Regions:
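Conserved N-terminal phosphate-binding loop of PLP-dependent enzymes in the Aspartate aminotransferase
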Residues: 1-394
Length: 394
């Protein structure tokens, strides 16, 4: 079969929910992917910020193979050792107290919403509470996650969504204050907006929201699904600001390719929120994903991944700034660490598609931002190679 045969086969069998690039990936190694024709691609997308250690990492692979040979799934009717080890590591890294493992980031958001609502229900003795989310945010595509996603394009066909969700403007504290009332139980936002165009929270905003939450007994939920797990130079992006959420979500690089997410909370929230029967999952937190999360966090801590990101990220920023200065149609770079975006005057889909011809994988964030979320193991030479390949098609 040739590449087109694979594409035609997929198009005839899979539900058409993605506008895929005409690329059939066969395997990967390090920071490179290879298609079924053997062509090499430098990957600066990392499976949308998932493959923190790149591809075909032997230590990670061996850990998963060993767990497959023991047991992959047992259900949550019983305890298992790998998920206990994973829980201890993620709680240490996040400074949180309790964790629930899910199968995806979207599921983590659903759990966080339920935990916030149950907390308020336990406190007040009644339901009907509200959540404040942000315009231009993205939290997932299930009904609950979609309800707090601030983009009408995604929401409109599926309305009515969850009631009681109001939208403020990201980094506008006054717009948040204006929406708070005695029904507000939570404020949710991404510490660094991804799909919304790579905007990070200002220090004044995130500290201001934390203060409002403390004043009104509102829970602060921070979505760290894309920006967490070392990507910004701290294990979680909120750790740059000296504030702490009441609930946070994680996924993507948490499993480095294995489908896993998590929502974490403080002991104060855990004591008043989800109890037996309130939430559950069949697959979530099974021994296989536990082994993956445990190994990922072990490697990140041992190999000082956040320190490496702090070292290489300024070089990526410098080279992207030079690119913006060189081309009139590129107007701005923004981001934190190895989560960067370059703004273009026109839609960037054509640039991402054209980059594939040069053996480079980059993706978009919204319609006019080119997104760079490479594996966290990249070196300066990889940045140079990326710039060279990108400039060849600009």
């Amino acid at each position: 079969m040739n590449k087109q045969d694979y594409i035609d086969g997929a198009e005839s069998a899979l539900l058409h929910t993605y506008n895929r690039f005409p690329l059939v990936i066969d395997h990967g190694d390090g920071v490179y992917l290879y298609d079924t024709d053997g062509k090499e691609y430098l990957d600066f997308a990392a499976g949308i910020a998932v493959q923190a250690f790149g591809y075909n990492n032997k230590e990670y692979n061996d850990a998963l193979k060993a767990q497959i040979d023991k047991v992959m799934h047992t259900s949550n009717l019983y305890y298992n050792v790998p998920i206990m080890n994973a829980a201890k590591r993620v709680l240490k890294a996040s400074q949180m107290n309790r964790v629930f493992f899910t199968n995806s980031g979207t599921e983590a958001i659903e759990g966080a919403i339920k935990a916030a609502k149950k907390y308020a229900y336990t406190r007040d003795g009644h339901a009907g509470h509200e959540i404040i989310a942000m315009n231009h945010s993205f939290h997932g595509r299930s009904i609950g996650a979609l309800s707090v996603t601030g983009n009408k394009h995604y929401q409109e066909p599926f309305e009515p969504l969850l009631p009681g969700v109001k939208f403020a403007d990201f980094n506008d504290l006054d717009s948040v204050k204006a929406l708070i009332n005695d029904k507000t139980c939570a404020i949710i936002f991404e510490t660094v907006q991804g799909e919304g165009g790579i905007y990070h929270a200002t220090e004044a905003f995130i500290k201001g929201v934390r203060a409002l939450c403390d004043e009104h007994d509102i829970l602060l939920i921070l979505d760290e699904i894309q920006c967490g797990m070392g990507r910004t130079g701290e294990m979680f992006a909120w750790q740059h600001y000296g504030v702490k959420p009441d609930i946070m979500t994680s996924a993507k690089a948490l499993g480095c390719g294995v489908p896993v997410g998590a929502f974490l909370m403080t002991e104060r929230v855990a004591e008043k929120s989800l109890a037996p029967g309130d939430h559950g999952t069949t697959y979530g937190g099974n021994p296989f994903v536990g082994a993956a999360v445990d190994k990922v966090l072990e490697m990140m801590e041992r190999d000082h991944i956040t320190e490496h990101v702090k070292k290489v990220a300024p070089y990526l920023e410098k080279k992207l700034d030079e690119l913006v200065a060189k081309y009139d149609f590129l107007t701005e770079r923004r981001g934190m660490g190895l989560m960067q975006g370059v703004v273009c005057e026109k839609p960037v889909g054509q640039i991402a598609a054209k980059a594939l011809e040069a053996g480079l994988i980059v993706i978009t964030a919204g319609s006019n931002v080119l997104r760079f979320v490479p594996p966290l193991i990249i070196e300066e030479k990889d940045v140079d190679e990326m710039i060279s390949r990108l400039e060849s098609i600009l």
